[in-house]
Swiss-Prot record:
Catalyzes the transfer of phosphatidylinositol (PI) and phosphatidylcholine (PC) between membranes. Shows a preference for PI and PC containing shorter saturated or monosaturated acyl chains at the sn-1 and sn-2 positions. Preference order for PC is C16:1 > C16:0 > C18:1 > C18:0 > C20:4 and for PI is C16:1 > C16:0 > C18:1 > C18:0 > C20:4 > C20:3. GO terms for cellular component: cytoplasm; cytosol; extracellular exosome; nucleus. It is found in: Cytoplasm; Nucleus. This is Phosphatidylinositol transfer protein alpha isoform. The modification N6-acetyllysine is found at K215. Phosphatidylinositol transfer activity is inhibited by N-ethylmaleimide.
Length: 270
């Protein structure tokens, strides 16, 4: 059985702004998760064109260890805790496939994202068969809702309910910020529709691990998009050329940090 959920993340930015903001925030967040031999290693980052689709292809390895639950760490041999992430970013559509060489076809996380200029009101944007869509749970993530954030993940400087952008005037986001967006002519909005497929075939552990992965994906999406909004003034003036230069520098920094820095960032919730 494969577990599917669609996470809907509404943001007070435009679809065009988000393209830059997402890439900037991915680079910054990678640094926060890398050190002590763990974290992110960028193997490939290059343009691609296939079957009429154009975009940016990336291949990364995530060295996990402390970022997986203890019960998996105890069972998995050394080297099995590295996962490969391949992403085809044909914005506003993006497809990410995460695999593991040890588990082969028994492990898969697939994240398909459509970025739309709406408030998360569209049904089945990924055009699944009606029978399949019927079994997909839609999960709404509110970046300003403190109750959706684990206490150990909370940082006041990354709280959209407290942040006000100097460059754009957006924020802080109150309890009814999404409803208020509709009446604010000068504030753009968008929704990232993230369809997440999780497959983990390991007798006796399947349900436990699939649910754990979805819990971690939700946590990741929540924390990441809170950061993205609170970093708005750092990226809102950047161009895609700026981003590509920054990605090159980040790749070099990550290689260095993995070797020299201590373990840091999000760890598994045992």
């Amino acid at each position: 059985m494969v577990l599917l959920k669609e996470y809907r993340v509404i943001l007070p930015v435009s679809v065009d702004e988000y393209q830059v903001g997402q890439l900037y925030s991915v680079a910054e967040a990678s640094k926060n998760e890398t050190g002590g031999g763990e974290g992110v290693e960028v193997l490939v980052n290059e343009p691609y064109e296939k079957d009429g689709e154009k975009g940016q292809y990336t291949h990364k390895i995530y060295h996990l260890q402390s970022k997986v639950p203890t019960f998996v760490r105890m069972l998995a041999p050394e080297g099995a805790l590295n996962i490969h992430e391949k992403a085809w970013n044909a914005y506003p559509y993006c497809r990410t496939v995460i695999t593991n060489e040890y588990m082969k076809e028994d492990f898969l996380i697939k994240i398909e994202t459509w970025h739309k200029p709406d408030l998360g009101t569209q049904e089945n944007v990924h055009k699944l068969e009606p029978e399949a869509w019927k079994h997909v749970e839609a999960v709404y993530i509110d970046i300003a809702d403190r109750s959706q954030v684990l206490s150990k993940d909370y940082k006041a400087e990354e709280d959209p309910a407290k942040f006000k952008s100097i460059k754009t005037g957006r924020g802080p986001l109150g309890p009814n910020w999404k409803q208020e967006l509709v009446n604010q002519k000068d504030c753009p909005y968008m929704c990232a529709y993230k369809l997440v497929t999780v497959k983990f075939k390991w007798w006796g552990l399947q349900n436990k691990v699939e649910n754990f992965i979805h819990k971690q994906e939700r946590r990741l999406f929540t924390n990441f998009h809170r950061q993205l909004f609170c970093w708005l003034d750092k990226w809102v003036d950047l161009t895609m050329d700026d981003i590509r230069r920054m990605e090159e520098e980040t790749k070099r920094q990550l290689d260095e940090m993995r070797q020299k820095d201590p373990v840091k960032g999000m760890t598994a919730d045992d």
